[in-house]
Every structure is written in structure tokens, then in C-alpha cells.
């Protein structure tokens, strides 16, 4: 279809060109024809390329072909097939000898590239349906899809491959049994975790998924301003209705919120707060409690802590420590750095720490607390740079104590400088460091979830409107 449209457009341009060169039309018409020809060719080329990429990103059959083994092609994926649940669960549990991460093959890399495109460009509905792994069927026979906390972290972490035989609308089926499910709560979330408060087993519904991504992608300062705007009586508290307004406004400013559309056919619609376990958590069982900004920011801090803990545990720490290379991978996960440069940075890290002692979760958490104040850190580092002081490890530790009130260990600073000390002179490349760390802090959730085609066409139309009048006027 794109080829036919392109050929027809080029044919019309050729006819117009012959008419333009063969006649003696006024100068104004010729200039308009030149402008139309240029814009038409640019639009056809851009739309063909971008829509072709879009088709690849949105096409579900691709991953089915990639993730299906030859021997499994005849398997029945019926949603009511509960008999194979134990077998699927056993397949998903890693064996002790398989804990060491294998090197990704060609097929795995292609699957991860496809999943990264889903994370980057798909709607929240499709992302949720792809990375969720559980479908719970209640007693009346109605089914609802849920994410586990591990599924949630995987849905926002690049290059984390979905388990085999689970993908878009492919789930592990569970029959609802209140007693049995309450006994399985510890399988999904530790007691004291934010996820433990999310209803049954710490499972995440679609409404909770949208809310949690909104909390993770919104700076603390934005919530403080929103709470003050809707705190009409000035007592520092908001009720449930006011919180719904705060939540709706904040969500509409995020990339997830802007891309979401209710899909009744898939069951993924944003429900009101009355149905959310989070609303019960904030306002009590009778929903008549009050929520303060202090309590909400504490919830945000705990959520960030729990997500970071899950990321840490995914690396299978040995004696409570992960390797320096794994920590570097956590820092660069959302960087968007080109693959060649990323590989070079990881090799440099491996060269410096062939037999490193590793990092504890406390060291990792202290560094990410430091990153939460990255804007203030950027200002402080700029002051040091303008004053002519070198940005060495001692300076970074001083900035961490002053700005974030945390202590960075010497070993953490060694790892960071091994990544971002490009010329090996012991000084930090602060511009690249701050840029990558800002993306890491937001986990890529602030990026627009589109191919940029609409923005391109709007820019071209605006440019055409501004320049058309100049082309139409004859030169004096």
C-alpha cells in the first residue's frame, strides 16, 4: 500500500515538474509548486518509514513466532486450561545450576529488542497484557489479569526478557480460592512491602499499574504543588475526592496517561478509586480518612525502595552483594547510549574490577538516594566546574553529604568513575553523568510513547504556514 501511494505521488510530481518546466506560468505559481513538491516528497518518505517501524512495533504475531519453539507449535493456549498450571510454574522456577546468567543468543536478542519496542511505543493496555503473567478466575467465572511485583519491574526495565510461553494474552490461570491465595501471599511480596498492601497476594491490577507508573515517573515537587492546589482549607490534608482530582491531573501529564485509552474489549479500563486497594490503603476501609502530603511522599519513597530492591534481587546477589558490572548495568539500563559505546563502557568496568568485592544493597540504595536530588547535584557540580575545581571522587562524596545527606562509599565512587571517567584522568565527565542519571532516575517513563510522526507533521505544517506567504510574494 505504501509503495503504491509513493509511486502515485511521485508520478504526480513528475507531471507537475514537466508542466512547470514546459510552460510560462507566473513566478508565484512556480514557487508554490516547488514548495508543495518538497513537502509532498518529505511527507511520503517520512510517513512510509515511520509507519513501517510502527507496524513492526505493534504487530503481535512477530513475538509469537519468535517465542514459540518448534515442538510447542501444536500446544493449545486455551484460557481455561488449568491442568498445566503446575507444569508451567515448575518451568518458570529457575534451577540452582541455571542461576548463572547465560549469554544471550540471536533469538533472545531479537525477542528483547521486540519487547523494548513494546515498552517504548505501545499503549499501557498492551504493555500490561504482555508482561502480566496471572489470570485469576473468581467464583462466578469472571476473569481478571494481574501482574506480580516482578512482572511490574520487568515491564519498565529494558532488556529483561519475558518468561517462555508467556506473552501477549498468555497467562498462568488460577482459580480463585480465598484461603489458598492468602497462604500464597508471601510468594509475591514480603511483609512490609508496598506491594503487600495491594489486595490479594500483592498482585497489581491494571488501575494499580497505571497509578504506580504515575508515581514513579512524577517528581516529588509536582505532587507537593498539586496537593497544595487542591487543599482548599489549608489543613495540609486531602479527602478521597480531592485526591482523585490530584491523581487525574498528574496522570494526564505523564506519557502513560496521555497514551491510555480505555479498552472494554480487553477489560483494561481505569476504575474509580472505590475499587482500588490503594484507595483503601490511603483512606481506610470506610474511605473517610484524610491523606497528607507527608504520608503520600512516604508512600512514594517506599515504592521506589521496593522497586530498587526487586531490581537488586533480580541479579541473584551472592552473600548480599552484586558485582560491579551488574551495578553498572543498573545505572546504564535507561541511558539510551549507543550499543557500541555501551559495550565499551561495560568492558572498561570489567577491566577495572576483575575480582571486585561487589556492592551491598545499602551502598546501592545510598547512591540512588543521591540520584533523587540530581537537579541539585547538577547545580553543585556546575559550581565546582565554574570555580575551576576538579570533579574527583572526594568532590562527589562532599556533594552527596551536602545535597542528599548520604555517605557514598569509596567503592561506589570507584565504579561510577570507571564508567564516566572517559579519559582516565580521575575526573568526572559531569555533563554525560548528569544526563544519564536523570534518565535512570525517571526509568524512561517520561519519554513520549510514540514514533514522533505526529509531532513531525505538526512541525512541517507550521513551517509551511510560516513560509508560504513569503514564497507567494514576488521578489522586488
Swiss-Prot record:
Residues 99-110 are annotated as: Polybasic region. It comes from the Eukaryota. InterPro entries: EF-hand-dom_pair (IPR011992), EF_Hand_1_Ca_BS (IPR018247), EF_hand_dom (IPR002048), MICU1/2/3 (IPR039800). The modification Phosphoserine is found at residue 122. Phosphorylation at Ser-122 by AKT1 impairs its maturation and stability. Ca(2+) 2 binds at residues 421, 423, 425, 427, 432. Ca(2+) 1 binds at residues 231, 233, 235, 237, 242. Residues 218-253, 408-443 form the EF-hand domain. One of its GO terms (molecular function) is calcium ion sensor activity. Residues 126-129, 259-263 are annotated as: K/R-ring. It is found in: Mitochondrion intermembrane space; Mitochondrion inner membrane. One of its GO terms (biological process) is calcium ion import. Residues 68-106 are annotated as: Disordered. Its main location: mitochondrion. Residues 455-465 are annotated as: C-helix region. Gene3D superfamilies: EF-hand. The modification Asymmetric dimethylarginine is found at residue 455. Keywords: Calcium, Calcium transport, Disulfide bond, Ion transport, Membrane, Metal-binding, Methylation, Mitochondrion, Mitochondrion inner membrane, Phosphoprotein, Repeat, Transit peptide, Transport. One of its GO terms (cellular component) is mitochondrial inner membrane. Calcium sensor of the mitochondrial calcium uniporter (MCU) channel, which senses calcium level via its EF-hand domains. MICU1 and MICU2 (or MICU3) form a disulfide-linked heterodimer that stimulates and inhibits MCU activity, depending on the concentration of calcium. At low calcium levels, MICU1 occludes the pore of the MCU channel, preventing mitochondrial calcium uptake. Belongs to the MICU1 family. MICU1 subfamily. PANTHER family: CALCIUM UPTAKE PROTEIN 1, MITOCHONDRIAL, EF HAND DOMAIN FAMILY A1,A2-RELATED. Heterodimer; disulfide-linked; heterodimerizes with MICU2 or MICU3. Homodimer; disulfide-linked. Component of the uniplex complex, composed of MCU, EMRE/SMDT1, MICU1 and MICU2 (or MICU3) in a 4:4:1:1 stoichiometry. The composition of calcium sensors within the uniplex complex can differ depending on tissues: a MICU1 homodimer can be present instead of the MICU1-MICU2 heterodimer in skeletal-muscle and kidney. MICU1 is recruited to the uniplex complex by EMRE/SMDT1, and it associates with MCU at low calcium levels, occluding the pore of the MCU channel. Associates with the MICOS complex. The EF-hand domains have high affinity for calcium and act as sensors of calcium levels. The polybasic region mediates interaction with EMRE/SMDT1 and association with the uniplex complex. This is Calcium uptake protein 1, mitochondrial. It comes from Macaca fascicularis (Crab-eating macaque).
